[in-house]
Amino acid sequence: MVLDSLRPRMSGFLEFIGKPFLRIPPNTISVISFLFAIISGVLIYEGGFFLIFAFLGILLSSLFDAMDGFVARKTGKASKAGDFLDHTLDRLSDIAILAGFSFSPHGSIYLGFFAITGVLMTSYMGTQAQSVGLKRNYRGVLGRADRLLYIMIFIIVQIIYPFDFSYYLVFTPFTILLLWFALAGYITAASRFTSSFRELSGQNKS
């Protein structure tokens, strides 16, 4: 499931719910999304019934994150500065949320390190391709939309069925999520690197 490939189909949904957002500057929307991500990270760390509010925070952060680009295009305020701010805040949001999972009593700092670096490398490879003249690379199994969906699903699992068992590692919904992000993150980063490198190598030969 690669939800980033469905972005063009989301335009109708954004049109339907986006009118109230058109009066808000796009950069402000980006900052609001980031603030919800920070709050969600703290709530995830706290655990317990706070996870319900963490789920809502992730949902709101995702909504505002989708809206900033939509509003920028609709109001003619799209800019490189806004895009740069949006991507910077997205990475900080990723760190804040995954840090909440990592330092949670149900998480793992060690798995969290690899999950965070895997996610950051995934995003870096996507935008680095664009910086050298290619299209932004969304290839792979762990785009940002996918990550946010997985996060919300595993928060629900932790609320409903908070299992905990050991087999070399301590497995909880949170550690399984971090392990998946670590593995899928590096696989996605490698996939994006390989596809971009091949395309660049082909340009040099032509």
Report residues per predicted region.
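Hydrophobic alpha-helical transmembrane segments
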Residues: 1-62, 97-206
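Hydrophobic, small-residue-rich transmembrane alpha-helices and their short perimembrane loops
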Residues: 49-63, 67-70, 74-82
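Conserved G/P- and acidic residue-centered "switch" motifs that form tight phosphate/ATP-binding loops
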Residues: 65, 86, 119
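Basic, amphipathic juxtamembrane/active-site segments
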Residues: 69-110
